[in-house]
Amino acid sequence: MSDDVDRIMAVMQSAFDPEYGEAWNRRQVEDALVLGNTHYLLAGEDGEAPASDAAAGDVAGFTLSRHGFGEEELLLFAVDPRFRRRGIGRRLLERFAAQARTRGARRLLLEMRRGNAAESLYLAHGFRPIGLRPNYYRTLSGPRIDAITFACGDED
């Protein structure tokens, strides 16, 4: 698992803008993965699982999610900027949804900051806004940004 955490951290470091403070640190990722209900997926350049011996720099994206009570929450979703606009995010989101459903998830959830470029991808995959948290995120430079919660599934 340590090698996979290295791969997750490499993508996260390149994909998340520090201005928004969305990236997790290594300890947060490791602590989440110790729990039996937290799952991750890695994506290579084709959006599929990379070879087990792939170097951290060869991983194009990842998801980290938590399952419980018939729901799966997408906690982190990232594609390295070098690999964006190639369908990797779309394929990774499809794989996430399929695997969540095999674990019994009837509803998929996520939260994002307003203005996140991935919003159109989420909408295209059936996610719908279900809530708004005004001024939820604070940027490093000070302004606050709303959080939007989305759901996809039988209860959205």
Where are these regions (language model features)?
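Short Asp/Glu-rich motifs
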Residues: 31, 35, 119-120, 141-142
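Conserved GNAT acetyl-CoA-binding A-motif
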Residues: 100-111, 121
